[in-house]
């Protein structure tokens, strides 16, 4: 009778590539009370030699690639190594214990494993003093999963993983592998199809169009402890975000800067320009440049386009050491259909949402995630936690939240299935986002989450305990749309559209908002910011300076896409750098300087950022002068504060030497900022000292606008006589009585 390891059924499964439990057959097996046996599988080999306790022995050859060697009882995995056909001498993968445990299984299949990035994928480690790489993957419907790479000549039968749970987790430790080793998964589906897949949990990949996964050993020594210790305090401070696409900010020798070059230049630039944070368009790995990173295949991997895993850590570390936070654009709403990645990962739609008639999202022709599966939610949650823990990211901006929240997003009737209550809300996505925000805020105080959400879904920034989604901030897409819609109007038509400016204040404090002028507004025929402005060149630049001043003054955090700060003329393209040579032109220099001064004023003026989500931080002064296009309001740091900033925006083209604003009783008023400054390329008007007017003085003055009384009894208010420059923002420091 053949020994058990030559059992025909076991061997046939192994040879045919359908053995799900190779660890039960291979490695060190007990043969009797006094003897163990080393059992090896080497398909195609004629002889196999083993170094056993310093001596070389030839293993017995059996049929179908099975080899064995009898050994003394109690031998350990460290006591022997196997010679491979390529000359490599390595320990036996199947002699080492499997480390995926019951707690791992419980947490992962519940969707709450907060360190899944250290338990799934390719994990460099030592077992019993032997260095190597643990490979772990979830593929519940596979007949076999193997790890393939240069180390086994990409032969799928050499290193099959062991199925360690009935719920589809597979594991194998491969001794001797090191960081830099390339690998993929070879998966045999239930139907027998062989798939070659990248690792969803891979930490690095070959440069696109390559899709090979690369083992990473995270040994970076961080120098940002002071930043991390203070991060929770900074969360309530000013937030002025510079949105950056890494591959097109600056080029050198006709190539994008790498992560390290970018770190050294961008950190200094942000300090110079008074930005508090950078937000990176997705630097998660993605196959297509033209997706800008929003079609992710490597949720745990920095793109290799600009350097290594460690290079991106250096970038973030450098930004922190210069006092700049780093926010990551992150895409948990959909993923691309590329066959090498997650689509139909184990021969079934493992990650995909399948309950709609078509699995593809109509807007992007990508797959949406199935948030009803705990393992899928854990995959996404683990990605976010990985970027915070291992890469020291300070914030995560969740892309396309609306597409996650609504089952019918972008779909016509009949193209979607309602939830169990008959509604269109994706209840599983709601629960995932609540879990995402709860865990991040509990585990990493001071790390911020942002929702790019374009609908009126309620309570985006309300705490989970109060029934909200728990985000820190919501992108105010309505404000952005209405503001740009107004600015695009030619001057004679603006009086009929001033509600575009005033309407957003009706809901400005319903959420904690961020005010973006993002990359989406300067591509695909929408024109650059300055290209949207009407009039001749002088007026366009004046309007851009006005726009930047308007954004700084409005309640809400700030975000500006790169190039807007100096008047980039062409639409943005991911395939070229910004037009930095424009800074040789006076008008562009002026906008750049104006942006710098506005940013400095913002970060140094608590009235513009402290409590800016509260209604008491804002008070209208006048929005009635639609004919001249003037709005004015006060900004406060607290409801009891007498030190306020008066923000005045003139959207028209006329110059008024005397313009009287209604005003609260004042003790003093002085001009802080005028975007029409000659130094900014303006006309130099608007610098006459403001004159405070009592109600009695107001009655005697001739005004250029309809005076709107502020007092409840309808009596004439105080006034402020200012010089109003054309197309400008004025900011005054005011002490109220």
Swiss-Prot record:
Catalyses which reaction(s): Transfers a segment of a (1->4)-alpha-D-glucan chain to a primary hydroxy group in a similar glucan chain
Q: Show which residues constitute the signal peptide.
A: none
Active site residues per record: 399 (nucleophile), 452 (proton donor)
Database matches in InterPro entries: A-amylase/branching_C, Branching_enzy, GlgB, GlgB_N_E_set_prok, Glyco_hydro_13_cat_dom, Glyco_hydro_13_N, Glyco_hydro_b, Glycoside_hydrolase_SF
Q: Name one GO cellular component term.
A: cytosol
Tell me if Lyase is a UniProt keyword of this record: no
Task: Give the protein name, as stated in the record.
Answer: 1,4-alpha-glucan branching enzyme GlgB
Organism taxonomic ancestry? Bacteria, Pseudomonadati, Chlamydiota, Chlamydiia, Chlamydiales
């Amino acid at each position: 009778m053949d020994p058990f390891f030559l059992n025909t059924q076991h061997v046939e499964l192994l040879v045919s590539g359908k053995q799900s439990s190779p660890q039960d057959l291979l490695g060190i097996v007990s043969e009797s009370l006094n003897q163990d046996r080393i059992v090896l599988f080497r398909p195609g080999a004629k002889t196999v030699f083993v170094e056993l306790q310093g001596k070389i022995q030839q293993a017995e050859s059996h049929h179908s690639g099975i080899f064995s060697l009898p050994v003394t009882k109690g031998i350990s995995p460290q006591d022997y190594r196997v010679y491979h056909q390529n000359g490599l001498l390595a320990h036996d993968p199947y002699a080492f214990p499997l480390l995926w445990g019951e707690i791992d299984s419980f947490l992962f299949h519940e969707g709450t494993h907060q360190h899944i990035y250290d338990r799934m994928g390719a994990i460099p480690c030592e077992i019993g003093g032997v260095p190597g790489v643990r490979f772990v993957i979830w593929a519940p419907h596979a007949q076999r999963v193997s790890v393939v790479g240069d180390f086994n000549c990409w032969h799928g039968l050499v290193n099959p993983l062991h199925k360690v749970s009935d719920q589809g987790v597979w594991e194998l430790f491969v001794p001797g592998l090191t960081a830099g080793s390339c690998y993929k998964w070879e998966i045999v589906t239930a139907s027998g199809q062989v798939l070659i897949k990248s690792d969803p949990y891979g930490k690095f990949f070959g440069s696109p169009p390559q899709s090979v996964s690369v083992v990473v050993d995270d040994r970076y020594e961080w120098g940002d402890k002071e930043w991390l210790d203070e991060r929770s305090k900074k969360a309530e401070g000013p937030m002025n975000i510079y949105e950056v696409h890494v591959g097109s900010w600056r080029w050198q020798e006709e190539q994008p800067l790498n992560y390290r070059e970018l770190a050294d230049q961008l950190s200094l630039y942000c300090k110079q320009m008074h930005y508090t944070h950078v937000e990176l368009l997705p630097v998660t790995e993605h196959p297509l440049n033209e997706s800008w990173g929003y079609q992710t295949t490597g949720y745990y991997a920095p793109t290799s386009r600009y350097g290594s895993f460690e290079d991106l850590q250096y970038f973030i570390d450098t930004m922190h050491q210069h006092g700049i936070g780093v926010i990551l654009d992150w895409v948990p709403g959909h993923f691309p259909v590329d066959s090498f990645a997650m689509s139909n990962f184990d021969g079934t739609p493992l990650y995909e949402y399948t309950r709609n008639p078509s699995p593809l999202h109509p807007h992007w022709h990508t797959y949406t995630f199935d948030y009803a599966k705990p393992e899928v939610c854990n995959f996404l949650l683990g990605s976010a936690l990985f970027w915070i823990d291992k890469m020291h990211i300070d914030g995560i901006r969740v892309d396309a939240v609306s597409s996650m929240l609504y089952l019918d997003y972008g779909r016509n009737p009949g193209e979607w299935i309602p939830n169990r209550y008959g509604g269109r809300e994706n209840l599983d996505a709601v629960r995932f986002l609540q879990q995402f925000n709860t865990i991040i805020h509990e585990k990493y105080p001071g790390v911020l989450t942002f929702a790019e959400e374009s609908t009126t879904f309620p309570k985006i920034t309300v705490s989970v305990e109060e029934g909200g989604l728990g985000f820190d901030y919501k992108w105010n897409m309505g404000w952005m749309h209405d503001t740009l819609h107004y600015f695009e109007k030619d001057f004679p038509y603006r009086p009929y559209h001033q509600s575009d400016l005033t309407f957003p204040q009706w809901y400005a404090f319903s959420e904690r908002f961020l005010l973006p002028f993002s990359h989406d507004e300067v591509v695909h025929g929408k024109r650059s910011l300055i290209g949207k402005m009407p009039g001749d060149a002088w007026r366009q630049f004046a309007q851009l300076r006005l726009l930047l001043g308007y954004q700084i003054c409005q309640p809400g955090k700030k975000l500006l896409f790169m190039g807007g700060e100096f008047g980039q003329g062409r639409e943005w393209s991911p395939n070229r750098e910004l037009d930095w040579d424009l800074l040789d032109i006076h008008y562009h220099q002026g906008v750049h300087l104006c942006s710098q001064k506005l940013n400095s004023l913002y970060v140094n003026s608590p009235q513009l950022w402290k409590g800016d989500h509260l209604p008491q931080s804002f008070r209208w002064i006048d929005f009635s002068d639609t004919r001249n296009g003037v709005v004015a309001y006060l900004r406060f740091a607290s409801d009891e504060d007498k030190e306020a900033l008066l923000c005045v925006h003139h959207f028209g083209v006329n110059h008024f030497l005397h313009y009287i604003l209604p005003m609260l009783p004042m003790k003093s008023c002085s001009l802080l900022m005028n975007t029409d400054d000659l130094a900014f390329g303006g006309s130099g008007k608007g610098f006459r000292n403001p004159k405070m007017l009592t109600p009695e003085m107001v009655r005697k003055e001739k005004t250029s606008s309809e005076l709107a009384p502020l007092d409840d009894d309808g009596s004439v208010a105080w006034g402020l006589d200012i010089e109003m420059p054309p197309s400008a923002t004025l900011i005054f420091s005011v002490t109220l009585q």
